[in-house]
């Protein structure tokens, strides 16, 4: 019952696809220029067909290696931060993962999607989705996958920081990639997914929709992705704006899957874990630009007292925006940490980091004594090298006015 709405939507979109195959006057999006927008999001121009403009107001895209577009259409209930997050997740999934079995070069996956005019349709809610398809959107000759604003918090917004809403963006965007990128180009991956899914069923995985077994490996991968990035270690409070009813401890997705973290997937579902590792980066590759009104400290280091850090621990590249005084704490992956025009305190927290304070009076934090570091000034940066191994690493500082050591604070030009 929990997935009846998703099942209805799947049937509706499949019906739309079948109807399009019968048409000879298919409608498509024109080329939309986003180069004039700082964040790549624009208001839909008048050149866009009316069946699109009567539902959507915003647009962005990713350009595949073949020069064609993968599209995003958004309704008015989506903030631009949310739209950027959806685009970031798509970019992450399509970023090549050198040395991996299925993700070493994802050019073919992205090209296949753009050839099929793959499009994320970002609705406010399910009612708006049904209204749009019943009102003419079915005539748009694009391969579409829905995502709703009430299931897609943006990194750093209030919902994300309080860990309120289940983030469905990874799963739903995966479905678009799977249907129009993976199926046409990765037959070996599809076979491996099916084997892993079948073994997981024997262990208790309850796939949905129950009467569509051909879709079970696709849904299974969506569940694996969520757990690989630890989105369910702390269960969300809301699921599509409805109170979430938890399943048994250690499970996710209303108890339908028997593991709730990357570590548990590795031990309880090794075949599924192996498939994920063959395509997905172990960390999130996109630059997360925090909301302009963000205040406080955003941490990329796991802190079990802060539920959001189970998600943020896989980020490596974060940018503060706006002018509020705010702080960043990195992790041990080697980060790109960028401040805003306010006063920022930035701690790399391990690994070799690129730290840019931006405007304002900014400080970089190191946990050791000042005489345990070597400081080298370059023309456009200051290099701080920790002489103790496995601690602060080697950080490159730019637009940083102060360095905070455990024993003193020094000023740098």
What are these regions (language model features)?
Residues 3, 8-11, 15-35:
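Bacterial Sec-dependent N-terminal signal peptides
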Residues 23-64, 250:
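N-terminal low-complexity, Pro/Thr/Ser-rich intrinsically disordered segments
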Residues 54-58, 67-207:
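Acidic/His-rich structured neighborhood in mature extracellular/periplasmic domains
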Residues 74-77, 206-213, 259-263:
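Active-site rim elements
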Residues 93-98, 173, 177-181, 225-233, ...:
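Sec/Tat-exported extracytoplasmic proteins
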Residues 181-253:
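Post-HExxH zinc-binding segment in Zn-dependent metallohydrolases
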Residues 225-323, 327-329, 338, 347, ...:
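Pan-zinc metallopeptidase signature
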Residues 301-365, 371-374, 380-391, 403, ...:
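Glycine- and aspartate-rich repeat motifs characteristic of hemolysin/RTX-like Ca2+-binding segments
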